[in-house]
Amino acid sequence: MAAMTVQLDMVSAESNIFSGRVAQLQVSGTEGELGIMPGHAALLTSIKPGMARIVKQDGSEEVFYLSGGILEVQPSSISVLADVVLRAEEIDEQAAVEAKRRAEAHMANAGADFNYAAAAIELAQAIAQLRVVETIKKNISR
């Protein structure tokens, strides 16, 4: 018996990143972690910066970094619209470490006109990218 699947289309501002049948999508919504499987109730929510994990029809997995965006779930399809989508292997770990360090330094030395919200977003994105890299490293070492 074939595994139940649903059509997933994941796009960034630049291109179509993934289009195919999946058994499951795991993503971080603004209200918490979401696990979307075939037959899930209709849903429209914001996505926060973090990891998206897909389980393909053949059982293999693929991991992505999403900078945030919108998730739409319909009975027969899932759409992920994100500003930036990176495959895990495309993440520059050193650049993410530097961005995290820079954001933390800005927050520690904040002046009266400091844009705390922008620094918090930069920090959250860097931490999310590093979590994706860490997850991939753990899976490789198994």
From Swiss-Prot:
Keyword Transcription regulation belongs to the record: no
Highest taxon in the source lineage: Bacteria
An annotated GO cellular component: proton-transporting ATP synthase complex
Function recorded in the entry: Produces ATP from ADP in the presence of a proton gradient across the membrane.
InterPro entries: ATP_F1_dsu/esu_C_sf, ATP_synth_F1_dsu/esu, ATP_synth_F1_dsu/esu_N, ATP_synth_F1_esu_C, ATPsynth_dsu/esu_N
SUPFAM superfamilies xrefs: Epsilon subunit of F1F0-ATP synthase C-terminal domain, Epsilon subunit of F1F0-ATP synthase N-terminal domain
Protein's UniProt name: ATP synthase epsilon chain
Membrane topology: Peripheral membrane protein
Annotated GO MF terms: ATP binding; proton-transporting ATP synthase activity, rotational mechanism
Annotated family: Belongs to the ATPase epsilon chain family.
Assembly mode: F-type ATPases have 2 components, CF(1) - the catalytic core - and CF(0) - the membrane proton channel. CF(1) has five subunits: alpha(3), beta(3), gamma(1), delta(1), epsilon(1). CF(0) has three main subunits: a, b and c.
Pfam families named among the record's database cross-references: ATP-synt_DE, ATP-synt_DE_N
Alphabetically ordered keywords of this record: ATP synthesis, Cell inner membrane, Cell membrane, CF(1), Hydrogen ion transport, Ion transport, Membrane, Transport
Record keyword Ion transport present: yes
Predominant location: membrane
Subcellular location: Cell inner membrane
